[in-house]
């Protein structure tokens, strides 16, 4: 697979048209895409704490999970703590995102289920985030929507590692081009950009400057370590400070 490095950010391109599993990111977490067959029964059992998110399903498809009474719809999430997820698909294919860890949750066991409308929402000046697995102690899985013409902070993380996957739209990745300057002193003229299109991933390690600018409306799904408040905003169009901003929560 072709990997390009931009200021420490690793960019990969994927072709996700085939049935089966495609690994999107790995390290402290595992993150993969799974496309089912038209009619298939599949068991996910390799992770101890993980989310199964229904990214896309055709009209008329039926998705059921052993131990969950409700039929799944697009955008729904099943959370597993310490047990396999047995999924049955009829009239697919259905496209799933699965993320989690081999490390178990310290307290919880069993399956839980959430509809898309009930996922934890964080309002952003550039769009929104949905924290698909809530504020989990082992890993994070997010949906990120960024409106055309807006951009995130130019930021870095002290501890957080993340894999962002662009599924819809066109974006620019901003990165540090002037390696002779510290992250906290970077100005716009010290950065460069590269365009990314679907389906591309951006792997971001701690201390790596990055920013996404939406050329069109864009939709990403990010898996990361659970350091959700670990953000240092070097440049921000809305002058937001570092860290978690309570005004963005509870919406």
Ranges and model annotations:
Residues 39-67, 158-183:
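Glycine- and acidic-residue-biased ligand/ion/polar-headgroup-sensing regions
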Residues 1-43, 70-142, 153, 186, ...:
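A short, N-terminal "cap"/entry segment at the start of jelly-roll beta-barrel domains
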Residues 72-91, 147, 195-216, 220-225:
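Conserved metal-binding segment of the jelly-roll/cupin
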Residues 48-52, 93-96, 141, 160-162, ...:
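Short, surface-exposed beta-edge/turn micro-motifs
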Residues 63-65, 80, 98, 153-154, ...:
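Short hydrophobic/aromatic-rich beta-strand segments that constitute the beta-sheet cores
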Residues 146-151, 155, 159:
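A mid-sequence, solvent-exposed acidic-amphipathic segment
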Residues 46, 89, 156-158, 214:
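Non-cytosolic beta-sheet module surface loops
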